[in-house]
């Protein structure tokens, strides 16, 4: 194993990746990650747990044929807008159509009827019902994906903590002196946020000359072969508490599944989350088995694990797993980093693992 230390530098995107408030984004580490892997010879790459898409975008920005994957439907749509899309933009007339309440349309009212006083005001819930429907009528899949991206980011930025983990609209509305949050951002109309995020997404679209794709699968079921597979699974801390992105962003998946949303909601939850499904990446007792299956699935690929120094399983456990599979491994460490809503520091760890 060859350890290396993080140093201060910046390798900018040639193209502009959009801003995001998404929890767990690797945006602050993406230049460091690319610096560590840029000398590896590879052309095809899979971002197996794509999230915001910032790593896949960095790979695309450097001419790689990238496949973005995320099991969450709303994330895969973001991947379609920013990674797979090479030349399609959302025009001013498209935007005006999306943001107009058309008198001839009988709009559904599911959000207004079911999410009153949970996440947004009555006026905002009505706006979401209208705009979501308008987006669904756009025929071009890439234009539609850009519109979805803008809607998702607008929803996130107007939420306290940028999450949908509890019923807490009152945090936005209560008249108190605040030591956190951004009330101005929360109170900015959806339309303004939407237009801003469309502009960012349009500026992010480019053709790198290679074929890029966005898919939505369980990473353990992906069959194609890739030169390099980047793996950034949901994080379980040393106390065994995992990050459940499906729970944090259930509302965005609900928007995607709008017509079937009522059948997916756990009505015993105050915030109307979606019914939970088992996820091996949130199970501290079985997550190592998940990693073992990934290593076996992509045994002929270079594997790049983005990890935390205090995660479960431990870094040593992962290294032992890789060595048992006859792989040669390098360890790279970032500086100590303090994460939002946490008092503890940890290091970002990059494990680069080569096949026999």
Language model segments and positions:
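Class I S-adenosyl-L-methionine
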Residues: 315-356
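Conserved Class I SAM-dependent methyltransferase catalytic core
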Residues: 275-326, 333-334
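SAM-dependent methyltransferase catalytic-core segment centered on the flexible catalytic loop
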Residues: 236-300
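Conserved proline-anchored active-site loop of SAM-dependent methyltransferases
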Residues: 33, 45-59, 68-73, 224-245, ...
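SAM cofactor-binding core of SAM-dependent methyltransferases
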Residues: 44-107, 113-116, 130-136, 145-148, ...
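SAM-dependent nucleic-acid methyltransferase catalytic core
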Residues: 9-10, 119-244, 260-271
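S-adenosyl-L-methionine
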Residues: 1-46, 54-61, 85
């Amino acid at each position: 194993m060859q350890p290396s230390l993080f140093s201060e530098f910046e390798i900018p995107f040639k193209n502009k990746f959009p801003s995001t408030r998404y929890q767990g984004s690797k945006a602050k580490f993406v230049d460091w990650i690319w610096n560590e892997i840029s000398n590896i010879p590879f052309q095809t790459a899979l971002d197996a747990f794509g999230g915001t898409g910032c790593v896949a975008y960095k790979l695309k920005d450097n001419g790689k044929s990238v496949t973005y994957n995320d099991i969450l439907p709303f994330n895969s749509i973001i991947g379609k807008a920013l990674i797979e899309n090479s030349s399609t933009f959302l025009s001013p007339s498209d935007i005006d159509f999306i943001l107009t309440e058309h008198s001839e349309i009988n709009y559904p009212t599911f959000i207004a009827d079911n999410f009153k006083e949970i996440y947004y005001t009555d006026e905002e819930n009505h706006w979401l019902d209208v705009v979501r429907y308008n987006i669904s009528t756009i025929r071009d899949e890439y234009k539609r994906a850009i519109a979805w991206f803008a809607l998702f980011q607008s929803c996130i930025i107007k939420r306290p903590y940028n999450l949908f983990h509890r019923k807490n609209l009152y945090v936005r509305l209560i008249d108190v002196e605040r030591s956190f949050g951004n009330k101005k951002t929360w109170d900015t109309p959806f339309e303004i946020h939407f237009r801003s995020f469309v502009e960012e997404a349009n500026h992010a679209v480019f053709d790198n000359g290679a074929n890029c794709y966005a898919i939505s699968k369980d990473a353990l079921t992906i069959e194609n072969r890739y030169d390099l597979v980047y793996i950034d699974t949901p994080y379980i801390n040393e106390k065994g508490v995992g990050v459940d992105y499906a729970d944090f962003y259930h509302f965005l998946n609900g928007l995607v599944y709008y017509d079937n949303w009522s059948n997916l909601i756990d009505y015993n939850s105050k915030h109307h989350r979606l019914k939970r499904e088992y996820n091996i990446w949130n199970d501290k007792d079985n997550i190592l088995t998940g990693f073992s299956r990934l290593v076996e699935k992509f045994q002929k690929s270079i594997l790049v694990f983005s990890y935390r120094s205090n995660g479960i399983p431990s870094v040593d456990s992962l290294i032992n797993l890789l060595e048992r599979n006859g792989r040669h491994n390098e360890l790279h460490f970032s500086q100590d980093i303090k994460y939002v809503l946490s008092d503890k520091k940890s290091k970002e760890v990059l494990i680069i693992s080569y096949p026999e």
